[in-house]
Structures are given as structure tokens and as C-alpha cells.
Amino acid sequence: MKDMKMQSSPETMMTRIPTPDPHSTGVREDAMDSVCKPWKLYENPYYCSSQSQQHQHQRKAFIWDLNFIKVFMESELGKAQDEIKELKAELDYERKARRRAELMIKKLAKDVEEERMAREAEEMQNKRLFKELSSEKSEMVRMKRDLEEERQMHRLAEVLREERVQMKLMDARLFLEEKLSELEEANRQGERERNRMMKPKILERACSSPARRRCENPQIKRGINPFPRVMRAIRSKSEKWGSKLECQKVQLKILLRQKTTPRCTPLLSSPPP
């Protein structure tokens, strides 16, 4: 773009060349005369040679070239000034953009710092929670182990309690069997005593039966009781012992069926009959 401007600028400058000012050209010619005086063979003021004329033509061409170069340089200076203005505007825009970018970078850095601090706080929180979780897990493992030990102890206690109950039941059974055997032995002895005591009475009744038949009332023969009496029912000791024996047998069966300790305590504490 700049090359095109540079190529088109001389043509535009040729079209824009102004007419030279005679006063300014005269001043320039006097300056050139004072600077470049031709050498004269004689100090003749009317001396004029062809070289001086040629020199004057060269001087005019030089002045023309200077005017052309001045216009060209002025146009180039205007372009340069415009470019400088554009560059200044771009520089200002770049500075503003850089300031905005710096502000944005500062803001992002602040956000990043906040995010980093938040992440560090979260990591510390996660570490603390992980430590608490690990401690809770270890506590749970310990509690499970203690619970398992307590369960084993309870099982062992149950087994020991069951064995103790079985032993107590066995002792109660042996005690009741012993008592039952004692009761049976006492029952047999009572039967023997009763039989031994009943034999003389039977003999006496057998001996006194003929005499009693002789003096028997005829009403009794006919089935009439002249003196009715109410006789009290007398139970023998053997019947009493038999009923107690049956009751204790029933209690023993209930005790062996239920197999509970509270049931056997009153039996063990009760005195033998």
C-alpha cells in the first residue's frame, strides 16, 4: 500500500506544482550568486561568457528541482505525519488494550489465587475428613471385634448356663429319685407293718364269729339295722403315702418336661414328707 502511494505521489506532485514566486526566485538566485560566484579572468563588470550563462541555466534548474523536491518532501512529510498520527492512535489503542489486559490479568490472578486458596482449604478439609473416616473405620472395626468377643462370651455363658441347668436338673432328678425310692421303701414297710398288725385282728374276728352269730339280732338277719351309726372314713397311712408319691411323680414329670431352674428350687427347698 505504501509502495503504491509512493509510486502515485510524483504524478500527483507534478500536477500540484505551483508557479514559482518571482520574489522568492530572486532571493534564491542572489543566494546562489553569493555562494557560487563564477571565476572571471578580468574584473570586468560587463564581462559575460557562455560559461556564466550555462551556470545560470544550471542554477535555475537546480532551483526548479529544489521547488519540486520541496513540494514532494512536504507531501511526504504530510504522509509521515498522518502515519505518525495513525501510529499514535494505534499506540494509544494498544496501551489501552494492554491496560485492560493487565487489569484482566490482575483480576484473573486474584481469582486464581482465591481458587487456589479455596482448593487448599478444600484439600485440608478432605484430609481432615479422610482422617476422621479412617479413625471411624478403625473404631468400627474395634467395635465389631469387641461385639464378636461379647457374642462369643454370651454363647459361652449360655452354654455354661445350660450345662449348669442340666447339672441342677440331674441333681434334682437324682434327689427326687432318691426320695421316691425312700418313699417306696417306707410304703413297703408300712404295708408290712399294717399286714403284721391286721393278722391278730383277723384271727380274733375268726374266733369270735360263731359266738357273734349266736347272739345275733333277728333284725340284722333280715337286713334291718336297729342302731344306725355314721362311721367316719378312716384312711390308712399307706393310702396317704401313696397319694403323696403320686403327686411327687407328677411334679417330677412336669419338672423334667419344662427343664427350668425356678421350678426345681421349691422342690429342692421343700422338706421331705
UniProtKB/Swiss-Prot annotation:
Any single biological process term in GO: trichome branching
Subunit record text: Interacts with STI.
Database matches in InterPro entries: BLT-like (IPR043424)
Biological classification of the source: Eukaryota, Viridiplantae, Streptophyta, Embryophyta, Tracheophyta
Phenotype reported upon loss of the gene: Shows trichomes with no branching.
Keyword tags: Coiled coil
Name of the encoding gene: BLT
Keyword Coiled coil among record annotations: yes
Region (Disordered): 1-30
Function text: Acts as a key regulator of trichome branching. Could participate with STI in the same pathway. Also plays a role in integrating endoreplication levels with cell shape.
Coiled coil stretches, renumbered: 69-199
Keyword Lipid metabolism applies: no
Protein name, entry field: Protein BRANCHLESS TRICHOME
Polar residues bias (residue ranges): 1-12
Regions that span the bilayer: none
